[in-house]
A protein has these predicted regions:
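Bacterial N-terminal signal peptides that target proteins for export
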Residues: 2-14
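Compositionally biased, intrinsically disordered or flexible polar/acidic segments
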Residues: 22-178
Length: 178
């Protein structure tokens, strides 16, 4: 077992404990909110996710197609683009992101599920942060359907100039448009 496998198993285990109303293959029933941190040190219900935490279905979360992704004590960033996926049961979710925190100014736009714009051009000064919340619906398609819209995962695409992410919270049962 290499360090990455060890880390993802520990992070996934921490996430499972944190995910005590999600139902599905990855989350036990009763979870209220999933918490991910991309900065700082482990904090109870918020596992730290650092590159190269590549998405694997068994782990249930990770980065996908994210060239140039850099992890620091202040969060993750890339020159222009990165993507983070999370296995989720079909449903509507309230997603809260904390952007910024990196050593450079960042401009971040977020797309979710089949490239739907959720957040546009959030400018964050060096060392500062911004919190944004949006609602997204995760769908499950027919077996073998691998489109970003119906693959059983929440797909979040971060793009812009030095797009950055410090924290991610996912809460089930949000009302569409809310």
């Amino acid at each position: 077992m290499n360090a990455f496998t060890s880390f993802t198993k520990i992070a996934a285990g921490s996430l499972l404990v944190a995910a005590a109303a999600f139902a599905g293959p990855f989350y036990p029933a009763g979870a209220t909110t999933l918490h991910f941190a991309f900065e700082g040190s482990p904090n109870g219900d918020r596992p730290i996710v650092r590159p190269p935490a590549i998405y694997h279905a068994d782990d249930g979360f990770g980065f996908v197609d994210s060239p140039g992704l850099i992890g620091t004590a202040l969060g993750v960033t890339a020159p222009k683009y990165f993507r983070f996926d999370v296995n989720l049961p079909a449903g509507t979710y309230e997603v809260t992101v904390t952007l910024g925190g990196t050593r450079e100014e960042s401009v971040t736009s977020i797309k979710a599920e089949n490239h739907q714009p959720m957040v546009s051009d959030v400018h964050v000064a060096r060392g500062e942060k911004a919190v944004k919340t949006f609602t997204v619906t995760v769908k499950h398609g027919a077996k073998g359907d691998t489109s970003l819209e119906s693959d059983g995962r929440l797909t979040l695409e971060f793009e812009g100039t030095n797009p950055s992410l410090m924290k991610l919270d996912i809460k089930p049962g949000a009302k569409p448009g809310g």
